[in-house]
Every structure is written in C-alpha cells, then in structure tokens.
Amino acid sequence: MLRKISPARLIVIDAFGATVSGLLWWLLIGTNPDIFGIAAPIPWLLGSFAILFSWLGWFHEFLNLSSKRTLLTLIVLNTAFCISTLLLLLTDNAITNWGIAFSAGEIIVVMTLVVVEWKAYRSLHN
C-alpha cells in the first residue's frame, strides 16, 4: 500500500504525523510528568522539534520545493528525532513504563516512516 503513495503525498503524511506527535509531546507528555516520568523541558523540546519538522511538509507545496530534497531532509530530521528520543530512554532514570511505551512507540512509527521515505527517495534518485 505505501509503495503506491506519491512522494508529495508522503511528505504531507509526514507533516500530519509530525503535527500529531508534537501535540502529543506538548499536551499529553508535557502536562503529565508524574504519569510518564518525563520532566520539562524535554517534552516541550521534542514537541517543538516535531512541529518545526511538520512545517517543512506543510509548506512543501507553497514553497515549490523539490520532493527529493524535502524527503532527504525529512529522513535526516526524523532520524535525528528518533536518536534524541532514544537518548531520552537511555538517560532518564525517572521515566515510567508509560513514558517508555510512548517513546518506544514514537521511535517505531517514525523509523517506519523513514524507511518508506528512503524507498521513495531512492525511487526518485534512480
């Protein structure tokens, strides 16, 4: 199913996912440090990065950006986001099982998207 998605549509899917992710970091994780064990400013920073990444996707069409460059940029940014989240998991001693589950789920979803974006990028590159 995901192979048939055009690069432009994949960029919009990424933008939507990054927006949802950012809002979850801000509104769910950031406001419930006792439940997730992730204290400020970490949720605000990760949420802000996700929202910033989403702008690239939302403005992709407005700015008439190259799909190849946008996909490559999103691949790099999404991978960096996952590395940051993984570092949080490895270094935060106060993180709860709910925080671990949310962060691990975030990494799985985003890295799956990175793999799909990489395949789309390679198909444009050839």
Where are these predicted regions, by residue range?
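Membrane-helix boundary connector in multi-pass membrane proteins
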Residues: 62-65, 83-103, 120-122
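Small-residue-rich transmembrane alpha-helices that serve as helix-helix interface/gating elements
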Residues: 48, 99-116
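Short, Lys/Arg-rich, polar N-terminal cytosolic tail immediately upstream
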Residues: 1-5
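Hydrophobic alpha-helical membrane segments
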Residues: 72-88, 109
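Membrane-helix boundary elements
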Residues: 7-42
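Canonical alpha-helical transmembrane segments
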Residues: 51-64
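Non-cytosolic membrane-interface motifs at loop->transmembrane helix junctions
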Residues: 36-43, 69-73, 96-106
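Membrane-water interface at the C-terminal end of transmembrane alpha helices
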Residues: 88, 108-126
